[in-house]
Amino acid sequence: MVGDTLKLLSPLMTRYFFLLFYSTDSSDLNENQHPLDFDEMAFGKVKSGISFLIQTGVGILGNSFLLCFYNLILFTGHKLRPTDLILSQLALANSMVLFFKGIPQTMAAFGLKYLLNDTGCKFVFYYHRVGTRVSLSTICLLNGFQAIKLNPSICRWMEIKIRSPRFIDFCCLLCWAPHVLMNASVLLLVNGPLNSKNSSAKNNYGYCSYKASKRFSSLHAVLYFSPDFMSLGFMVWASGSMVFFLYRHKQQVQHNHSNRLSCRPSQEARATHTIMVLVSSFFVFYSVHSFLTIWTTVVANPGQWIVTNSVLVASCFPARSPFVLIMSDTHISQFCFACRTRKTLFPNLVVMP
């Protein structure tokens, strides 16, 4: 008797749970909408929320580990490699993307709407855009740095400059300055979450929305993505030059049969392989995200699934890149081994030139 009663009440309790968390406004459930359709829609939001939660949580943990690792190297007095500052900046930018986009989107997917007012939404979107663009610029800097280091004939005077810590600091500063200024237009576009007063807003992210005219949206899309496409073009050129140089050097080594010549390029080849994995994954994820973003900007009424997938794809690289670096960096493996065996921090650390 009790079991039959629970079977009858279970669908009602499930529907009540979804109504409790997802019916914060009248737009979630129309009068003519069937309750089963609403249950499917709410279940889809739960799946999106779980995806955002796992991706954001894992990504923040990975990037936080990298930031702590590079800060430990700095504070313990060990010499930093030229790429350590670039990689730490990449981890910081990725953390900004996940923190200012992944966390609010996760909470909105689970039904926690109206978390931010207009001012909060503006700054959340602003810092997310800055983090995304700094991540792009940092990948370009890392790619160009490795290309010049691998093949100094590309730019002789730059090969000397990249060994200077001050020059690396200056390049990292240049990754921030233009994007802090150029993304100020986001403060004019973003509003608070949709409600009965601003239901005409164009794109709804659950916790924030933005509204702009079609002419302004098209102009903003062109100005916004033009530097990005130029950066992607630079990535393709630098990556192509590295692949060509490694292929030519491999042919030379095979022709000379010299172990002496193959020693150093093997280390450079491993570093180049790691950077190529980062660049290729960034290129794929960012290209898909750019296409979806342009679609939501130009199209009059983009579907909510496009907006959701755009945010999910945008967080793929920041969540996955730290683990590529963790698995490929020998310093990190030495650090983990030292912690496991409870030895002194970095007892046998070999500093790369």
Swiss-Prot record:
<keyword id="KW-0675">Receptor</keyword>
<feature type="transmembrane region" description="Helical; Name=3">
    <location>
        <begin position="133"/>
        <end position="153"/>
    </location>
</feature>
<dbReference type="Pfam" id="PF03402">
    <property type="entry name" value="V1R"/>
</dbReference>
<feature type="topological domain" description="Cytoplasmic">
    <location>
        <begin position="154"/>
        <end position="169"/>
    </location>
</feature>
<keyword id="KW-0589">Pheromone response</keyword>
<feature type="transmembrane region" description="Helical; Name=7">
    <location>
        <begin position="304"/>
        <end position="324"/>
    </location>
</feature>
<keyword id="KW-0812">Transmembrane</keyword>
<dbReference type="GO" id="GO:0019236">
    <property type="term" value="P:response to pheromone"/>
</dbReference>
<feature type="topological domain" description="Cytoplasmic">
    <location>
        <begin position="78"/>
        <end position="84"/>
    </location>
</feature>
<keyword id="KW-0325">Glycoprotein</keyword>
<keyword id="KW-1133">Transmembrane helix</keyword>
<comment type="similarity">
    <text>Belongs to the G-protein coupled receptor 1 family.</text>
</comment>
<feature type="topological domain" description="Extracellular">
    <location>
        <begin position="296"/>
        <end position="303"/>
    </location>
</feature>
<dbReference type="GO" id="GO:0005886">
    <property type="term" value="C:plasma membrane"/>
</dbReference>
<dbReference type="GO" id="GO:0007606">
    <property type="term" value="P:sensory perception of chemical stimulus"/>
</dbReference>
<feature type="transmembrane region" description="Helical; Name=6">
    <location>
        <begin position="275"/>
        <end position="295"/>
    </location>
</feature>
<feature type="topological domain" description="Cytoplasmic">
    <location>
        <begin position="248"/>
        <end position="274"/>
    </location>
</feature>
<feature type="topological domain" description="Extracellular">
    <location>
        <begin position="106"/>
        <end position="132"/>
    </location>
</feature>
<dbReference type="InterPro" id="IPR017452">
    <property type="entry name" value="GPCR_Rhodpsn_7TM"/>
</dbReference>
<feature type="glycosylation site" description="N-linked (GlcNAc...) asparagine">
    <location>
        <position position="117"/>
    </location>
</feature>
<keyword id="KW-0297">G-protein coupled receptor</keyword>
<feature type="transmembrane region" description="Helical; Name=4">
    <location>
        <begin position="170"/>
        <end position="190"/>
    </location>
</feature>
<keyword id="KW-1003">Cell membrane</keyword>
<feature type="topological domain" description="Extracellular">
    <location>
        <begin position="191"/>
        <end position="226"/>
    </location>
</feature>
<protein>
    <recommendedName>
        <fullName>Vomeronasal type-1 receptor 1</fullName>
    </recommendedName>
</protein>
<feature type="topological domain" description="Cytoplasmic">
    <location>
        <begin position="325"/>
        <end position="353"/>
    </location>
</feature>
<keyword id="KW-0472">Membrane</keyword>
<feature type="transmembrane region" description="Helical; Name=5">
    <location>
        <begin position="227"/>
        <end position="247"/>
    </location>
</feature>
<feature type="topological domain" description="Extracellular">
    <location>
        <begin position="1"/>
        <end position="56"/>
    </location>
</feature>
<dbReference type="GO" id="GO:0016503">
    <property type="term" value="F:pheromone receptor activity"/>
</dbReference>
<keyword id="KW-0807">Transducer</keyword>
<feature type="transmembrane region" description="Helical; Name=1">
    <location>
        <begin position="57"/>
        <end position="77"/>
    </location>
</feature>
<comment type="function">
    <text>Putative pheromone receptor.</text>
</comment>
<feature type="transmembrane region" description="Helical; Name=2">
    <location>
        <begin position="85"/>
        <end position="105"/>
    </location>
</feature>
<dbReference type="InterPro" id="IPR004072">
    <property type="entry name" value="Vmron_rcpt_1"/>
</dbReference>
<feature type="glycosylation site" description="N-linked (GlcNAc...) asparagine">
    <location>
        <position position="198"/>
    </location>
</feature>
